[in-house]
Regions:
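Intrinsically disordered, low-complexity terminal regions
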Residues: 2-291
Length: 291
């Protein structure tokens, strides 16, 4: 897991780069271009900076399967923009990008990736991605989202997942079943999982980030700071431990033990046996029964 300070240092740089982009008008008819793909397992999407009116955004990526089994990328955009977007393979990595110094004045850029299975996803520049069933590996999955990027998945069953979000990025899932999970959030990033089944989960949140889930997790380890929020009141757990600091809040439901260190006006809301609480508080922090 990367050190927290790197996330904070990258935020000003990201916005500085965004402000110095040159606006480039693109025209031409909406065109569809297909690019054949070999055997790739990693995806990187970056520097596709788009603007329409007052809104700035990135490319939309959709991963899906069809009966052809043919690995390919299909991009739909104006003919001018298609010429500026690079889709190439570098070893086992599929890289999709454009110029880091340009922002394209257009309504959309959609890229469909067919019959690829990824174990590593790196998105930047406000990229929006939807990963359908069967497009993500079921052993170990690494996800890194930067600069207001987002990833949405339906259901996933796997051994291990490592998620790192920064710069107001987001991760959403309907259902995840796994053994071990690690989530590292900074810069007002957020995670929402409707149904989470896991053995162990490690959470690290900073900079007004948020994590919300329902389900069942055996062991939860949390470190939340900078007005972050962890809402796992609808997650049944046997053991919760960690730290809340800097006006952060944690909502937990436990059936075994809960051991937390609260500081800097942080708040713990809990459901469970109060006799099993082991909580230290300082700096105006508080512990409250959830109702």
């Amino acid at each position: 897991m990367k050190k927290r300070i790197l996330g904070f240092l990258s935020l000003p740089l990201f916005f500085l780069v965004g402000c110095t982009n040159k606006d480039v008008a693109v025209s031409g008819t909406i065109t569809i271009k297909e690019v054949e793909i070999e055997d790739v397992s990693s995806l990187e999407v970056y520097n596709i900076n788009l603007k329409s009116g007052f809104s700035s955004f990135g490319a939309k990526i959709v991963c899906l399967n069809d009966d052809s089994k043919k690995k390919r990328a299909v991009i739909t955009a104006s003919s001018d923009l298609i010429e500026k977007v690079s889709i190439k393979e570098s070893g086992a990595t599929l890289k999709i990008s454009a110029s880091s110094h340009e922002r394209y004045l257009t309504d959309s850029c959609e890229i469909y990736l067919y019959n690829c299975v990824f174990n590593s996803i790196n998105l930047a520049s406000a990229t929006q991605m939807i990963a359908n069933d069967g497009t993500l590996r079921e052993d170990k999955l690494d996800i890194d989202l930067k600069g207001a990027s987002s990833l949405e998945i339906n259901k996933l069953a796997l051994n291990e997942i490592d998620v790192e979000l920064s710069g107001a990025s987001s991760f959403k899932a309907s259902k995840i079943e796994l053994n071990d999970a690690s989530f590292d959030l900074s810069g007002a990033s957020n995670v929402k999982i409707e149904s989470l089944i896991a053995d162990d989960i490690e959470l690290s949140l900073a900079g007004a980030s948020s994590f919300k889930a329902s389900g069942s997790v055996d062991k939860i380890e949390v470190d939340a700071s900078g007005a972050s929020k962890v809402d796992m009141i609808n997650v049944s757990s046997s053991k919760v431990s960690g730290h809340l600091s800097g006006a952060s809040s944690g909502y937990f439901s436990f059936r075994g033990s809960l051991k937390l260190d609260l500081s800097g006006a942080s708040t713990l809301y809990y459901l469970g046996d109060s006799s099993s609480l082991d909580v230290s508080t300082s700096g105006g922090s508080s512990v409250k029964k959830y109702n």
